[in-house]
Every structure is written in structure tokens, then in C-alpha cells.
């Protein structure tokens, strides 16, 4: 059997996807399924004074119209069960249609259920809602009196202070810069829009086909909301058409689909429209970040101050921890201060979006480092090397398997960085301005709870199950590769099943935790399997392992267990099962949340090098070349790992150059509500992207040695592009996206 972890493998689900056989959540065929259409508020704050649904109810095919006047109350889960890794998250603290209050424009105020989507949409347009509007808070300035400084975010400290920052910033002998960087609202727009099909069987059993990153979380939230036993709620989601965070929590359409089906007495599908993705499925909050840096003339940082301001909603707390997840850990400095300020406003709740905190945080910090390098007349790579942190700057413990220096070196070599002329506007390709920029990438290594079930059959095939997810990342393939190696069977003999709440516990597919977390559960289950086989073998007089101690036995070759000290004394899985008269054997592992390792810090690292070209007469930025070198521990699947980094870079190009959601200051509604106005990168915008990896497996982090790769690719890339734009033009744009009007 050839090595299964590491080599490039075609995706095991690839054929299903390209032939259209893969079923996404709203594609399941459910008999007599009706359609739900949501009605939105057109004010940002106030109360509903009246709702007229008579015309809507008169539309042929309408089965029910739900409003706050006729919708039963939902039940909230206890906070300790709802928040956190095991219980799921509701993105709004309020439940839909349970009161007359309006907290943001686009809030769902009614649900129409009809036999066809056309009937539901027509009826929805006939619902008349009267309001008593109030003055909304829509900006940081308007909500200044409501400012909050949260101490923690998901148990992570976000207000950080080390050393005397004030003294360093006042020291006249130091070189200093202070600048403010702005990122706009960015909206989730995966290929697959969010959606749910709800099917009741009586009053006590509910099945949801839901586009989610967390089937177990949805199961818990929905079971509590409807007062059901957990095992009576099934969540099914075998495929996800992209998520990036927007499907990690439970949004209001999920609960409305279930309630609509309950009241209408038929299955109901609610498919969030592209338009409603801009109000009902989450966004990255806008940020305003002020960076102050002080360094000696040879480039040694003496102080870093990172003050972040972000928005959240009045119905759900979300903190985009920009500084805590970048400045708090990236560079060595005797003085570091990170402050996070959050303003509650009347917009829908922000949510996780690929590298929440790290993505905007690294943009600001890495641009500030570039500006400092110019003030010092120092190469940007040399400045970063001068301040490389072997230990965590605020926890003072060593980083495990950190190879950032090698990433800088290899990236610079592949890119040809040594040929860079540091002077702005000094490099050209004919009449076109050429700019080269770089930045550091980073993302934490996360571990959560998980369980895995393995069924080994006598024909040397195995099925592995976990209620985890494949968001399009290649998880099916990676988990099959891990299972193949850990169990000891050929890749083709493994079937990995996921995406059902019936399976053993799987964590949210977020925080780049899945490979390490689920991989650890698979490792544990494989160990239990080998032990179970050993227990059969040592009791079997026909086995070469008869009467030996099970603790002395391990997997010694593919499909065989044997003595640790003498691999020649071994027995085949298939033979053990056949002699025992068993067609199969089944085991299940349970991995609890690991205790914090206070002796080491676990973080992934990388370096982006970027080239841009800009016609000075029409200053549109074209990214023409990117080299990204990553240090993420063991590479489980070379092909999908490369794709994940490339995808992060592409998303970062959108962040840097095109993506922005604008709001009407009068209504609070987003003005950009489709892909014609909200510009994501297309093939024409994406350059050659070279991806490479450095470092060794991080076995101190988990027994697989792998750290996640889903999010690190987007960190730092927007800064690398912005730095390249400055190098090309001599103009520093500090508010994203970098559109042509900002370069004129």
C-alpha cells in the first residue's frame, strides 16, 4: 500500500459533484414540499403596529402566513449549552416572529408558505406591514455612547497589555508611524445560498435538510427551540457549496422553515435568495484600526499599539478580534497594547467570515509594518526577520514547529524578491507600473471535541463515520486519507461518511479545526480497533498472537497487527475476523476538549509575495503574480491543501480590490444586494498563484501532525496587495477596497 497521507489524490466526491449527483440541502426531493417566502422589514428600528395578510392569504396555493401575531413562542437553550463548541450558536438572541420589535432593516417580519415558490413570492409581496419607526444607530459615530470593550471573545482575551507602550511612543529617539486602516462590510456570497427543508413526522420528530457547517449545533438549537428530545431531531447535510463561516451558526430562516412546516402541516423549503444573503446570512463587520509602531533605527520594534473598532448588532454580540488575533502574537516587542471596541448598531448580526479577526487584523498590521520599513529605509522582509518571535510575545511560551523564517526565504527565492528596487514607481513593464509587496500570514491551530466510529469488515473494507462536514474543502478526501493510514487499509477500501447528526459528534467546520480535530478522533478510533482485533487474536489458538499481551500488539503493516518488538509475528485483520466468525467489528472513540497546553503555543504561519501592474492612465490594479509559502504542519492532502491556500488568496484579492457592501444611510438597507453590484473576483482577476509548504509535522499539536489550512491563505494577502500598490504608485491607500478612484 502506497503512502496515503500527503500525496495528491483526486477528490473522492469529485465525480458526484461534476455529474450533478451530489445532493445539496435544498435539492433533496421531499413529497408535497411547500415553499416559504420571507417578508422583510423596510425600517431599521421601531415597532410593527399592524400587519394586513388578507390579500396574501387569498392567493391560490397559500397554506399559511406566519407573523408575530400567530407564531408560537420558541424556547431558548440554556446559555451554557448554546454558546460554545458543542451546543451551536444562534446568530440572534431574539427569536423570529416572537414580538413586534424591529432591530434592523431586512429583519424577517413574516413568512408565507405556499404550494409553489411563485405563489409564495406573490403572496409575500401582498403582505402589508405598518410601523412606528424610531431613529436607528447605523455608524460608529452614531453609536459612540453605546461603545463596549469586551474582555473576552469565545474565552479568548481581547484586551491585551504588555510593557509600557506610552513611554515607547513618546521616545524621541525611536522611529514611529501611526496610521488608521479601514475595511468595509464584506458579505458572504458562497455559490450555494443558505437554505433549509423541514419535515415533521408527527409532533415530536423533525428532520432538517440544512446547509450548515455544524449539524450537531443545529440539532441542539432546534431541539431546544421546539422542546424536542435531541435524538428526535435529525439534521442532514452531506454536501455544502461553500460556507466560509456564514453557515456556522443557526440563522432565522432555519427556525422559520421548521415553524412554517409545523403550522402548515406539510414539509417546507426556505431557500435564502441571493438578495437576502445580504441581510440574513451574515457579513464581516467593517473595521477601523489604528496602528502605532515604534522601532529603533536598526528595526527592532519597541512598541506595537493596535486599537480596533468594529460594529455588532443590537440582537447578537459578535466581536471581530482584529488586534488580539494578529498583533498580540506576531512580532517580538517589549511593549504591546491591543484594544477592541465594539459598537452595537441597527444592522443584521455580523458573523464568522474566513479568518475572523486575523484577516482584517493582518491587513492593518502588515500595512503598518510596510510603512515602518519605508520610514527606516529597510527591506520589508528584513524588518520582519529582525522582529521574528520564537516565543509567543504575550504568553512567553515557545511556538511549536514554527518555520516562518524558512517561509520568508523560500517565498523570496521563488518570487525573485532580491531583484526588487525599493523606490516607489521605479519598476515598469513597458508603460505599465509594476509593484512588488509582501506580508506575513498567520492563523491559530484549533482543537475541539470529536468522536469517530469505525466498522471494519472481513473483506478488508471499512466505513468511518463522524458528524463533521465537507464545505467544498476536500474533507471527504482528507479524512479518507487519514483513515487509510491510521486503520491500515488501502485508500480505496475506506468509505468516510459525514454530514448527519446521527453520526458520532463532530465539531463545527470552522476555525480550521476539522483536520486536526477529526483526524485525532480517527487516530483514537483506529487504536481502539487494533486493540479490539488484538483481543480477538490473543484468545485464538490458531493466531500467531495467541496468549500474548494486547498492550504489546500494534498495527505493524497494512491490514496486519503484530508484536511491537517483532513485526514478523503478526496476523491479518481479515483472518482474525473470519476465525472469530465475525463479518465485522465496530468501535467508537470519544475525544473531549483538550486541556490548554501552557508550555507551547500552536500557530500556523506563512508569507505572501505579490506583484501588481497598474496602467497610470487608467489606474485599475491587476494582480499578476502571487507566491504563497505556508507552514501548517503535516500536509495531509497535497492537492486540496494547495487549493485551500489558492482559495484564500483569491478571496483576499476580492477583499483588497473589489468587495464592499454599502448601506443606505436613510433606511439602513444594503444598497449592494446582488453579484452585479457586489464584485467578487472572476477568472480574469486571478493570476498565477504558486503555493509551497515548509516545516515538519506538528506532533506536539496532535497525533496526525497537521494544522488547519482553510483560513490562513486569506490572512496577509490584502496587505501584500496594498503594499505592492504603494510600491507601484507611491500612493498609500488605507481604506479597502483599492478602487481606481482612490489612485487618481
Regions found by a protein language model. Give the residues of each.
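Thiamine diphosphate
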Residues: 230, 239, 243-265, 269-271, ...
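Short acidic, glycine/serine/threonine-rich loops at helix termini
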Residues: 75-80, 123-126, 210-211, 219-221, ...
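Extended active-site and interfacial segments that coordinate phosphate-rich ligands
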Residues: 12-16, 125-138, 213, 220, ...
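Glycine-rich loop/linker segments at domain edges
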Residues: 7, 13-19, 80, 86-88, ...
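C-terminal catalytic domains of large/alpha subunits in multi-subunit enzymes
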Residues: 59, 69, 227-232, 262-270, ...
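Flexible, low-hydrophobicity surface segments
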Residues: 1-156, 179, 253
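Short, aliphatic-rich beta-strand segments
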Residues: 36, 206-210, 461-466, 623-625
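Helix-loop-helix junctions that connect adjacent transmembrane helices in secondary transporters/permeases
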Residues: 145-226, 388-461, 671-682, 687-693
